[in-house]
Amino acid sequence: MAGEFRWQAGRPDTAQAGGWALAHCQQRFLQDDNGLLFPREWLKRQDLPLLAEHGVGHWQGEPVYLLELDEPLELPGMAWTPLRQFMLHGDFDQFCMLGYASQIGIWARHNRFCGNCGTRMQALGHERVMQCPQCNLHQYPRLSPSMIVLVTRGDEVLLARSPRFVPGVYSTLAGFVEAGESVEQCVVREVREEVGVEVANLEYIGSQNWPFPHSLMLGFHAEYVSGEIVPQEDEIEDAQWFSLDALPPLPAQRSIARHLIDLYLARRSGAAEPVLPG
């Protein structure tokens, strides 16, 4: 987050008037030529298919509210922009705000009714939780921990591509932590499953919020130990060892995947180490 603290997550009271508003639906945000933040009272007069409203924080000291819509209604002079576009380009503080808002919107949408008894859930004002008034079930915003790892072998790195990637792009390996395992155990298991090799000497590098839709990426470097690359069917389209001076197209600069690669390059060359965004 930038030093000015332009964005701070929080829970502004929806009973209060005024403030800014974001309109969100299906991981897309409403935008016009002036940006994404609309005067809240004006936006609420636009006859939007409002599903829920949540206070999500403050932008430059002003309260920000999320209007979660039932469907992405088209409005003159406005367009719906996918969240991922803000991750790739523009103001990173703004992306942090949108990523948080998107996760809150999806959580609220998915927890309108109690999964235990079917009663409509209620948002509690003093903390970010949905509560069932019938059976007292509490549902907090979902967070899915996931490891992401750069496997190294001297001046080579192991990179892979999924069928879902942009054509030609290779990245680090990643996978969700399963119940009952540590993140370190997840690294070893996922590398073995995805490419068939064994790793050791894990080094934790850092973490990054990844709101697509609700992951927390925990980044590692790991050293190759043994095994030949065998890509996991249906998950890995291709995996190869790449020399540091002959790398393929890589992930976006702001991603933790790219940071893991750039950090290793800097360390091998003696250059200044990059800073992980976010």
UniProtKB/Swiss-Prot annotation:
Molecular function as annotated in GO: magnesium ion binding; manganese ion binding; NAD+ diphosphatase activity; NADH pyrophosphatase activity; RNA NAD-cap (NMN-forming) hydrolase activity; zinc ion binding
Binding site for a divalent metal cation 2: 190
Required cofactor names: Mg(2+); Mn(2+); Zn(2+)
Binding locations of a divalent metal cation 1: 174, 194, 235
Pfam annotation, one family: Zn_ribbon_NUD
Superkingdom: Bacteria
CDD domains per the UniProt record, alphabetical: NUDIX_NADH_pyrophosphatase_Nudt13 (cd03429)
PROSITE patterns: NUDIX, NUDIX_BOX
Residues annotated for Zn(2+) binding in this entry: 114, 117, 132, 135
E.C. numbers: 3.6.1.-, 3.6.1.22
Residues where a divalent metal cation 3 binds: 190, 194, 235
Subunit structure: Homodimer.
Name the UniProt record assigns to this protein: NAD-capped RNA hydrolase NudC
Organism, scientific name: Pseudomonas paraeruginosa (strain DSM 24068 / PA7) (Pseudomonas aeruginosa (strain PA7))
Lineage: Bacteria, Pseudomonadati, Pseudomonadota, Gammaproteobacteria, Pseudomonadales
